[in-house]
UniProtKB/Swiss-Prot annotation:
Function: O-methyltransferase that catalyzes the 2 O-methylation steps in the ubiquinone biosynthetic pathway.
Species of the source: Escherichia coli (strain SMS-3-5 / SECEC)
Protein name according to UniProt: Ubiquinone biosynthesis O-methyltransferase
Gene: ubiG
Family matches, as Gene3D superfamilies: Vaccinia Virus protein VP39 (3.40.50.150)
Keyword Signal: no
Length: 240
C-alpha cells in the first residue's frame, strides 16, 4: 500500500505509525526498544494457545502485528498466520525476519476494517495486542475483529487501563525511569478502561470469556499473568 492509500484511511493515526516506523529496524533486537515485547511474548502466546485450545492447524489473524514477534511465534505453533499492520517499515522487517527464520507468515499492509470487508468469518483466532490504544477509533477495530472470526472462534485483545496507576507505571516508570520503551510511546488519554472495551465487545457478536492482568515486577525484573487489571490486561472473547 502506498502513501496515498494510507492517507485515505480514516482509522489511522499517522503520528503513531511514524513512531514505529522510526525504530522498525530494531524490532528483533532483544536488548532494544522492543525488549519488553520479546519478554512478554511467551506469556501472551501461552495464554492465547491455552484459551483457544491450541493453535495447530488453525487460521490466525494478528492485527497490528508490527515486526512480527507474536505472529511468528504463533506460526511456529503450527498456525497459518496472517499479520496486518499499516506501518510499511515494520512489515518489511517482519517479512525479512520470517524469511531468515524459515517461518511462513502472510504479512499485509491493510487496516483491519478493510480486511474484514474482504475476509469476514474466515479466521479461527484473531489477536489484537497493544494496538487499540494507537488508533483514533478503537471500537471500529473491535467491531472488525468480530466480523473476521468464525462462529465459535476466539478473539484476543490486550491494552492498557486508563487511570493514575497505569500512567505512573506505563508512562513515567516504563518510559522515563526504567527506559524500557521509547519516550512518547504511550498517551494515557488513549488508554482504555476494561468497562469501555467490554462495552464495545457487547455491541458485537463476541462474548467475554476471561480477563487477566499482565504484571511487571521491577525488583525481580519479571512479568507474570494474574488477577488485577489496573495497568496492562488481556481479554479473551469468543464469537457466538
Amino acid at each position: 500500500m502506498n502513501t496515498e492509500n494510507l492517507l485515505k484511511n480514516n482509522n489511522v493515526d499517522h503520528e503513531e505509525i511514524a513512531k514505529f516506523e522510526a525504530v522498525a529496524s530494531r524490532w528483533w533486537d532483544l536488548e532494544g526498544e522492543f525488549k519488553p515485547l520479546h519478554r512478554i511474548n511467551p506469556l501472551r502466546l501461552g495464554y492465547i494457545a491455552e484459551r483457544a485450545g491450541g493453535l495447530f492447524g488453525k487460521k490466525v489473524l494478528d492485527v497490528g502485528c508490527g515486526g512480527g514477534i507474536l505472529a511468528e511465534s504463533m506460526a511456529r505453533e503450527g498456525a497459518t498466520v496472517t499479520g496486518l499492520d499499516m506501518g510499511f517499515e515494520p512489515l518489511q522487517v517482519a517479512k525479512l525476519h520470517a524469511l531468515e527464520s524459515g517461518i511462513q507468515v502472510d504479512y499485509v499492509q491493510e487496516t483491519v476494517e478493510e480486511h474484514a470487508a474482504k475476509h469476514a468469518g474466515q479466521y479461527d483466532v484473531v489477536t489484537c495486542m497493544e494496538m487499540l490504544e494507537h488508533v483514533p477509533d478503537p471500537q471500529s477495530v473491535v467491531r472488525a475483529c468480530a466480523q473476521l472470526v468464525k462462529p465459535g472462534g476466539d478473539v484476543f485483545f490486550s491494552t492498557l487501563n486508563r487511570n493514575g496507576k497505569s500512567w505512573l507505571m506505563a508512562v513515567v516508570g516504563a518510559e522515563y525511569i526504567l527506559r524500557m520503551v521509547p519516550k512518547g510511546t504511550h498517551d494515557v488519554k488513549k488508554f482504555i478502561k476494561p468497562a469501555e472495551l467490554l462495552g464495545w465487545v457487547d455491541q458485537t457478536s463476541l462474548k467475554e470469556r476471561h480477563m487477566t492482568g499482565l504484571h511487571y515486577n521491577p525488583i525481580t525484573n519479571s512479568f507474570k499473568l494474574g488477577p488485577g487489571v489496573d495497568v496492562n490486561y488481556m481479554l479473551h472473547t469468543q464469537n457466538k
